[in-house]
């Protein structure tokens, strides 16, 4: 796993998240292209972090004027990918390496393909950002 360095802006968002939710974020990724921040937390804290009816997330979004996405972090690739693609149902995950580039092929239920990809590919982009940061994976393909 590559060493993760956090910027002062990422640390600021993580601190704000903890103040609002009481949950410690493991990591924060700022995605300016989609005007959002992605927070990785321990999966068992997901309910507390989101808050009743999404109250904590909405409060944070209002404060920072960005969309907030929370992902349950897992050490192994398979569980992490399932969390990243949720609520889409993942059938198989295959890693292919060619010319020093790693690609993850994620097969989902046919009716869940749109959910897995997301509007304008934002869910695939989120998966790519996180998998690149933690597992040095270069691209993500949903099939």
Curated annotation (Swiss-Prot):
Cell location:
Cytoplasm
Gene3D superfamilies linked: 3.30.300.20
Name the CDD domains for this protein.
KH-II_NusA_arch_rpt1, KH-II_NusA_arch_rpt2
The chain positions of domain KH read 34-100
- Gene Ontology terms describing biological process: DNA-templated transcription termination; transcription antitermination
SMART domains given in the database record:
KH
Tell me the GO molecular function terms. Answer: RNA binding
| Protein family | Belongs to the NusA family.
Q: What is this protein called?
A: Probable transcription termination protein NusA
> Taxonomically, what lineage is the organism?
Archaea, Thermoproteota, Thermoprotei, Sulfolobales, Sulfolobaceae
- Gene behind the chain: nusA
């Amino acid at each position: 796993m590559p060493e993760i360095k956090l910027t002062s802006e990422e640390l600021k968002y993580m601190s704000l998240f903890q103040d609002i939710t009481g949950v410690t974020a493991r990591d924060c990724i700022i995605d300016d292209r989609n005007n959002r921040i992605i927070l990785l937390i321990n999966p068992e804290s997901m309910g507390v972090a989101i808050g009743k009816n999404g109250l904590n997330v909405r409060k944070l979004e209002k404060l920072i004027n960005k969309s907030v996405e929370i992902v349950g972090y897992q050490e192994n690739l398979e569980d992490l990918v399932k969390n990243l693609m949720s609520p889409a149902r993942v059938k198989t995950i295959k890693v292919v390496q060619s010319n020093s580039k790693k690609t993850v092929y994620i097969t989902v239920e046919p009716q869940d393909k749109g959910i897995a990809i997301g509007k304008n590919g934002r869910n695939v982009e989120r998966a790519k950002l996180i998998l690149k940061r933690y597992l040095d994976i270069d691209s993500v393909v949903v099939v």
